[in-house]
Regions:
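Beta-strand scaffold of nucleotide-dependent catalytic cores
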Residues: 19-21
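Conserved N-terminal beta-strand and adjoining loop/helix that marks the start
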Residues: 1-17, 37
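The catalytic Nudix box helix
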Residues: 33-65, 104
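Nudix hydrolase/Nudix homology domain
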Residues: 26, 31, 93-147
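Active-site-adjacent beta-strand/loop module that shapes the phosphate/pyrophosphate-binding cleft
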Residues: 59, 69-91, 99-101, 122-124
Length: 147
């Protein structure tokens, strides 16, 4: 079975989590934490910063590692490394995603997550990361712009 290694940014602002909705492929309309594949010679952190810049035109800071999720899909095995992050600069422009939402802890289960991301949500609820808050003096990431 094909193995894919990816990284995901759990971007938090004022106790809410940023989720994106896929606009393409077999899993179109499913929700996920933004991120992508780790390229050869790239660290996980470098990959995450690059992917968020490419997908959302935003620079993030990585606060801490959260978890690694292994998940079997019909055609591949996914290993996803997740990091708690914050916006450093940018306005979270949706360059690839169909939609995005800021979800507080009580609303994390209101969207149709991809299987691996669903495991991350469960992990967030059980580890106490739902209470994590960061007060930054950065441009307001509340506004999500569409390309």
């Amino acid at each position: 079975m094909k193995h894919i290694e990816v990284v995901a940014a759990v971007i938090v602002r004022d106790g809410r989590y940023f989720a994106t909705q896929r606009g393409y492929g077999e899993y179109k309309d499913k929700w996920e934490f933004p991120g992508g594949k780790v390229e050869p010679g790239e660290s996980r952190e470098e990959a995450l910063i690059r992917e968020i810049r490419e997908e959302l035109a935003t620079t993030i800071g990585i606060d801490r590692f959260i978890c690694t999720v292994d998940c079997d899909y019909p055609d591949f095995h996914l290993t996803m490394h997740c990091y708690l992050c914050h916006v450093v600069s940018g306005h979270l422009q949706l360059l690839e995603a169909e939609d995005a939402r800021w979800l507080d802890g009580s609303h994390l289960h209101t969207v149709d997550w991809l299987p691996a991301d669903k495991e991350v949500v469960t992990n967030l609820m059980h580890t106490g990361f739902l209470t994590f808050r960061r007060d930054d003096n950065v441009s307001d990431p509340e506004t999500v712009s569409r390309r």
